Amino acid sequence: EVWVCGGQSNMAWTVRSTRDADLEVACAHDPLLRFVRMPLEARGAPRRDYVRPEHGGAGKSWRVIEPRSVGDCTAVGYYFAQRLRRRLGVPVGLVDVSWGGTLAQFWVSKPRLRQIASVAPMFAQFEGQLANWLEAGGEQGAQQRYEAALAAWQQARAAAAEAGDKAPKQPGLGPYQDPRTKRHPGGGYDGMLAPLRGLTARGALYFQGENNSFGDMYLPFPDTYPAVVAEWRELFGQPALPIGLIQIGGWSTRRSMTYDMNHHANVVREVQFDTWQRTPNTGLIVTFDLNSNSSIHPGHKRPVGERAARWALAEVYQQRGRDQRPLRWRGPVFSTADVDGGQVKVRFQEGTADGLRLDKNQASGFYVAGEDQVFHVAEARVVEKTAVEVWCDAVAAPVAVRYAWSNLPLGSLMNGRELPAYPFRSDDWPLRPHRSDSSYVRRAAGKGGR
């Protein structure tokens, strides 16, 4: 069973950097669980030949899971595959095509991207940067400019120290790098995915979206994120290739209600949710509840991999529990919100809210707003076993409810399997993320996913 693991840094995050590394690495022995990491390469045209990665030394492609190798393996992929191995008893191989800091358009072919109007500004920006970089001497010119900037900084630092002033910030390499790397639209597809054409993959996991939640990078995401699914299915010759979409978590700090309610991360999560809902043979794995330190790289990767494995075992492999019932992998999925006086009753998609509960019986992560569209923290309680009633004394006539809606979401709602509810909102009001000159308007979510 071969699974492709793609995305950015949270998929690239290795076992050695996780919270469980001190327990896991020393006892990792499984000759039937193997992985290969594709070399990080962005190209202007599809690579047709497969370059054997040198990550393991001795020219090896597949690396066997053992203490000396497991530290290099994608952590999410490892814990996912580990659960599949235990349940299915078959060999599992992971092909890691992740690269930290990448955008969704990095993993889609250029011909497909050229058909997406919202990506045109990114192409224009990239082509302009590349032309300027080449005109300025390419790699040699960049090295000379960086050395000059570094020398000027050293002089300024010495002068500041002599004057007792704060030292200036050291220049970074970013402005001097070849644009034909992570900023290259379609570059990752051409350099890392195209060589895999014809691979017989059982499915894929895709963990990406954080870099589309900065500035205006969210603007093409409603087009480029579902394009990844379509592109990968075409690449592997499987129109119904199962793809587990891993929803981004949260990071940084909450600042104000307006900041939280409009944050880019909400846009990304909503696009991920809507892509799942309208795309058959996909699953969406929640992660916002697994971040304990507000880092953009949460250290707990085992539960992410195991939740993804729940989806795969249930939907791809049709596995059942001890009671012969289908495995449950989804948390409560929003369905409807009905206003009754000063309260909003929220219902969920059938079969997702059995055993509905609030963690430690404490309501957290609920917000309501009236016609003024100003949100307030709300109270909530479980009613009728599978619904939740939400209210706020400061909002006499609520018209909208949101849950786990923030750059760093809170949320205590879960089902009886303790699978967290997906972030949701009942309104379709435009969002205006900070540091953005544009607004996001939700498209019709549609149906068709599972």
Q: PLM features: residue spans?
A:
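Cell-envelope and extracellular/periplasmic
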Residues: 1-450
